[in-house]
Amino acid sequence: MRESLNNSTYIYLFRTFSKITIIILLSGLLIPSVSVSEVPILQPGAPGNPTRELDAETAVNIANSSYTGADVEFMKDMIIHHHQALLMSRLAIPSTNNQAILDLAGRIDVSQEDEISFMQGWLQEREEQVPDPTSKHSEHTHHTMIGMATTEQMTQLAESKSTDYDQLFLSLMIAHHDGAIKMVKELRDQPGSTYDPILNKFASDITNDQAVEIERMNSLLIGLSSDPRAGLASGLYDAEEAIMNMQLLESQRKPMGFYDPANPAERGAEEPDENTEREEESIEGDEEEITSIEEDAKNRRYPMLSFSNTDMAFRDDILVTGSYHGFNIYSISEEGLPELITSVICPGGQGDVSLVGDLLIYSVEETRGRLDCGLEGVIVDASLDRFRGLRIFDISDLSRPKQVGAVQTCRGSHTHSVVSGPSPNGKILVYNSGTGSVREEEELEQCIEDIPGDDRTALFRIDVIEIPVDDPSQSRIIDSPAVFADPETGVLAGLWRGGDHGDDSQETYITDQCHDITVFPSANIAAGACSGNGILFDITDPSKPHRIDVVTDSGFAYWHSATFNNEGTKVLFTDEWGGGGRARCRAWDPVNWGADAIYDIVDEKLEFRSHYKMPAPQLETENCVAHNGSIVPVPGRDIFVQAWYQGGISVIDFTDSLNPIEIAYFDRGPIMEDELITGGYWSVYYYEGTIYGTEITRGLDILKLIPSEYLSENEIAAAALAYPMIGHRRAFNPQQQVPMDWPATPEVARAYIDQLLRDKAIDTDTADQIIEKLDQVTIEMEMGGNNRLSRQINRFSLSAEGLNADVQTKNRFERLDATLKGISDGLRK
């Protein structure tokens, strides 16, 4: 059988068994021989059948666990799997002249053929059947294997040429390699599998080598993309940029004290033994093992203190940016540019913020948080010094904020939502979402983990917190409702229990927490992005939210955030696949994983309409997934500006829920060329005509939208005039959504006219007549009004009657008519 083994087999044998032989020889020297008396060896049969006696050799064969049936099936399947990779690669020479593709195909050809020979030898050595990958049976079998191309896809590949071949080859081969990695994972899940050291090493090599090759292929696929964001050059402060229909006004670096001057990018450190092992391998003459960028990132160590920028809140001319390290307060100029006023150090992460009057509410979740805002952390399991929950600061003196309240919670505060208040009795109501570990009971009473049968658990709940404005020190949890419970049985885990949804679906997190709850108080509803489900809540009684509807999505890994449109008739949910720290916008990632899901609210039910994912392929060094954003209040349209971590900023129009389209973007290259560092935009929000983005690692960016084929100058101007219909006139809190309204001004009227012209719903002559009158309004208003112009504008009677118009067009006509009537009223003396 040795003749059938190739060089790779001997390498595996030499590396593995040279070490094992030494151990066996040493064991022989140390273990004394023991005399064992002969006794019968018996094997019972099935119930009712006789017991039979075995000889020693047969007994050993029965008990032999050096390899399993799962190992054998894995090797057989992998031979067929590898064979298809050979077929795909050998189509390259007649199909493309791209040297990078030809080199890749050549490497795959050689490596896969060698590994097929090794697997055949492994099976032959154990007298197992060796499949013929060219047989009809094998061709039929491969359709059920993970990552294998279908017959139709193979035919399409064979008929493709040049760039079409390159793109299809890379897409199919990435899926093929990823399938091999999943086959290894499935094998390792089987009891007793990969016990054979040779097979174990081979399986590990497949996982690592294929992951590295996937990263290389992703880079090649990005290089074929025509999107300007694909393949941007790296840099911490000098990365290459791509921008469409936006203007970057300013980039401000983090304030002093909010970054490590010796490590501003917050790079992790390698494990010391990794360096030692690599040096030893180099000395021994072995080739250094290359690992994937993602695997390298997982294996790095990070310091206790984190300086990541997080969320934002606005009030009047004030901007507050949160951080894992504290928060910063800025004054916003008339041009929309922030100027730093105060920096407050108070570690604990993740630092989500809200502003209500002179109070700043701040989320703390990490176990290192201290009640006194100390930097040294807390190292013991239970301590009264530890703080996890909601901090409350008095910022009436912006130059010297003071902590005036602190509400301890069992799982800390990952995010929070200002639901209502101040009420007539001076109370603010807040929903708290804790996603961290449950505290020790010795540290905080009634904090109970997931003990089977104990309904007191801190899981499967949110906290309702009451903050008295006059005395925030008396803030407290007034309830912790089990909002996921089954209404009939009362079982707390009443929603998604975790796991996948079937073949080719995501592993979705269990619904035992809400990450974000966005409230829409004017309609008494809230949207919960609750780990395993999207939920629509009734908050008519804000202290007792209850579910109206629940949805799930087989492509969502973790329901992360929710945003209503301005009318509260739609919800855009986001999926944080990979937790935000992983590259999940690669060229080969599914377009409905780590994406947005858009739902219409119809009769209090969430009805799915579409997915949207930022379309530019990203490198392996760019963490990217859907994250926080806000509505851009363009009247008559649903426009959303959103953070995608290192995927940049994407602005979408989802007025047509079925067909969301990207209308603007801004992006930078990765922080590092060859290392995955968590960075990019945490949050991107629109406030009074300007877009602000907290860059996790770099600082704070300020941008504006500019006119384009998608968005007119009048629409941009109208959005800047929008104001909250209820509550404070100038405010924005991330998870408290208030519908915006617009004044009756020429800019707003022109915005509606632009939309009707774009949709060819109004004739040009009528539009020109209205615009001519609107052009006179500003001057006449400055002069105290004009009754004649008022009557002329009032005579315009606009309606969609007689037109075959959709609901959106009818609404625009109605709003334009109402705006013109408002302008007319304002002109009267």
Feature-to-residue mapping (PLM):
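Hydrophobic, helix-prone linear segments
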Residues: 33-43, 51-53, 113, 120, ...
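Short, solvent-exposed segments of well-ordered alpha helices
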Residues: 69-76, 164, 171, 303, ...
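Generic L/I/V-rich hydrophobic alpha-helical segments across diverse proteins
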Residues: 82, 89, 105, 112, ...
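Feature marking well-ordered beta-strand scaffolds used for ligand recognition
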Residues: 226-755
